[in-house]
Amino acid sequence: DKYYNKDITTGTQAFNYGMKHLRERCGDDMFIVESIAPLFPYQYANARRVSCDAWGEMWHTNYMMNSLSFGWWLDRVYAYNDPDHLVMGDRSEAENMSRITTGAVTGYFMIGDNLTTKGSYVGTEISQEKVKTYAVNERVNAVVRLGRSFRPAYGHKVSGSNRSVDLFTLETEDAYYIAYFNYDEGVKEGELTLNDLGIDPETISGGIECWSGNSVKVKEGRLSYNLPKHQAEIYHLYKK
């Protein structure tokens, strides 16, 4: 017996053949997410994971954002970038918020905690409570629903143990978004010069920080920030 197509002689041909068959069988009713798949050919999946085995620790967030730092453009190829399952578990509040922020700035959101209350493998109460706290922030979720990957502000500046960009931006028709991560153990504070990020301060009418809902302070073209250990913030600036 023979179970192969003799006309296929390369790995790329085999990948195309198999994925074309899978896509046809799935139809338009199934969302296809590739994990550690080749970047190309790309036309068979709706999304592709930009990093794998990222959990809830800060160094995992740093690792995931390293992948986005250099793979942000892939949401121009696939419909969505996948930042891996977002796990909170027993990590700190700051780590939880930062990990959820990775989903917001990637444009794709999939909770990784076990939330089941019945069965042979029941989830933990702490995971259930944290999801109700951190996965339902409407301002943050509105960023997720944009379905867009932020771009690194400075591609040549990296930090943290996994060497990631810490500052990302996104422009939409009516707003600018800035995401800032603190991968370090200490407080990060200072000012961001909006012009350096390609944002004309004269076009801004105001803004908020999405996690807290606090107003953003922009003075003389600079945005003030104060990020506690392992904290991430998302600044939503309104266009005039």
Placement of each model-derived feature along the sequence:
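Glycan-recognition and catalytic regions of carbohydrate-active enzymes
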Residues: Y78-V87, G112-G186, D200, S215
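Beta-strand-rich binding/interaction modules
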Residues: V187-S212
